[in-house]
């Protein structure tokens, strides 16, 4: 159950959050908890995630409670609100925010779980009331698993400075490249798009390190990501008047755009384009190279004992196995140092995995796809599981080769001897 009341100025901030999330996905989740009301969304390709958390003190009145259902074995079962709304149904309600801020005295939002409806009521001056009944779909919200605090590069800048910079880019711009050094910050058009002769405009914007509230660069980095999500969080940050924090590592690793405020907290996690140079120098690539060296050594030793014909027969009949097989706990802990995360699911199971969150995107001879985004997979989580974590947005889910997770992405399987490598192409 959810009940909350907002004033006119608070409705404007809430509407800006809805508009920012609409740049990511066509649907979003209402996820109330004792920490506040969270709005979450994930795009269809699982390469972008957005979450805005409104603390209880943001609202004039905030009430949330979980339903308790008695089971046959006399054990209480806590049922949390599973509410997924279509963006097309709720976005027109918060379209004219300036008019709503001037004319609305208060806004009331509550849920009717028995009828699967979210009710939004606007109370205008002179006793006028407008009510919207929106049907929702019962669906478990998703939460990304990504620890932004361990990123090598961290920036903090006022949103107005960054908003003035993106004015230089055209409306048709799909991707931008962020290049940083210990002294400079450069935001420019994507290199791939600049090669297109139909797009004659190439923009670059340089900002000195003294213009930032916080500027920490651990290594020179150049990453490429989608431009649409950046514009969305900039619009929202201008409404909250809070600085934007940017966390990132090398290409292929996710980029985090965050707003931390006493009343509102926002996190946008974006996938970045991976290149050959970054994959060769990444910790995952080091692990893969060591793995290949060991497999090559085993094959050389095996070649001394069996004939080439026997090897060919074995390679044809050998069943494909995962790139990282089940190993001892010491091997798993060693791979965790290479950036292996965990994935949370709805039943509360948290499984350790030995694969990196960045998918293996090695070049395939003859492949027509030259640009690859690292794909992010997500596990469904319930509100009660958030209590086991220090932060609601602290980690990014791993890439999985399970049959269920592979339905939303286009995957190729490459066999090399007895090893099977999975990689996602977006």
UniProtKB/Swiss-Prot annotation:
The keyword Lyase does not apply. Expressed in testis and skeletal muscle. The modification Phosphoserine is found at residue 359. It holds the Pfam family Rad9. Coiled coil: none annotated. GO terms for biological process: cellular response to ionizing radiation; DNA repair; DNA replication checkpoint signaling; mitotic intra-S DNA damage checkpoint signaling. Keywords: Phosphoprotein. InterPro entries: DNA_clamp_sf, Rad9, Rad9/Ddc1. One of its GO terms (cellular component) is checkpoint clamp complex. Interacts with HUS1, HUS1B, RAD1, RAD9A and RAD17. Belongs to the rad9 family. This is Cell cycle checkpoint control protein RAD9B. It comes from Homo sapiens (Human). The gene is RAD9B.
